[in-house]
Regions:
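N-terminal, membrane-interfacial amphipathic/helix-forming hydrophobic leader that caps
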Residues: 1-102, 106, 128-129, 243-249
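Alpha-helical membrane-spanning segments of integral membrane proteins, especially the hydrophobic core
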Residues: 64-67, 101-117, 144-155
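Generic preference for well-ordered secondary structure
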Residues: 9, 13, 52-56, 82, ...
Length: 249
């Protein structure tokens, strides 16, 4: 059990579990909403124009809307839950706080750049050593990146700008703090990283080394969070890491 838990609201592993379940449920609900609207639209079009519905397959635009709505819904849940259940912890920088505050030393941002570089090099080496089969990369991210037009632009913006903000706040911020208020920092960091890896599974099933890549990134981001008592360096590192795969040749 952690001996550094600070006084504050009741916010521990149980609340972290509810936070995680709500996050997943909101994401699924946002996804389903997009597909329901698409299906209803197809049904109405079929009735109004008197043609058989057939077996339509949702395209990249539907997947893009599903991804966007899922992201928005899960981010809204995260914001509302923390505001209701753990607001006093928001700007506390210790392991038992959420860490939405600047680091105490500017060197934290230099460390963030180093973390992004190490994670990017590791990912590149894994790709060189165990090249992925493009035919097996059929996760949502891969499908959207191969689509033309706004679906590709949308997923790029979400991956580069949205994910570093929301995922750091969720995993290295709120969830880590909830666990660290009862458990040790190593255990909390390990569990947080495993959950982080698991939630990236849909895009990694076609290339198993991808799980190692995400795991290394998650572990490094936890180290940044604990060392500098702030989420902000991790957000920078996450942004740089994701950007490297979208904007570097």
């Amino acid at each position: 059990m952690s001996t550094t838990a600070e006084a504050g609201p009741t916010f521990g592993p149980l609340q972290g579990l509810w936070l995680m379940l709500g996050y997943l449920t909101a994401q699924i609900a946002g996804n389903l909403l997009a597909y329901i609207v698409w299906g209803v639209g197809l049904g109405l079009d079929s009735v109004l124009h008197h043609h058989p519905l057939g077996k339509p397959v949702p395209g990249a635009a539907v997947l893009a809307w599903a991804t966007l709505l899922g992201f928005a819904a899960s981010a809204a849940w995260l914001y509302l839950y923390i505001r209701h259940s753990a607001r006093p912890l928001l700007r506390q920088g210790g392991a038992t706080g959420i860490g939405w505050c600047p680091p105490r030393v500017p060197q934290a941002y230099v460390a963030a750049i180093a973390v992004a570089l190490v994670a990017t090099v590791f990912a590149g080496l894994m790709v060189l050593a165990l090249p992925p089969d493009p035919d097996k990369l059929d996760g949502p991210l891969s499908r959207l990146l191969s689509a033309p037009g706004w679906p590709r632009l949308m997923v790029t913006l979400l991956a580069v700008c949205g994910a570093p903000l929301a995922e750091e706040f969720m995993f290295r911020g709120a969830l880590f703090a909830a666990l660290a208020r009862r458990w040790s920092v190593p255990v909390s960091g390990t569990v947080t990283t495993l959950v982080f890896v698991a939630l990236h599974a849909p895009d990694k099933l076609g290339w198993w080394p991808g799980f190692l890549v995400v795991g290394v990134l998650g572990a490094l981001l936890v180290l940044l969070r604990v060392r500098y008592r702030s989420l902000w360096p991790g957000m920078l590192a996450h942004f740089l890491y994701n950007s490297s795969f979208f904007f570097l040749p």
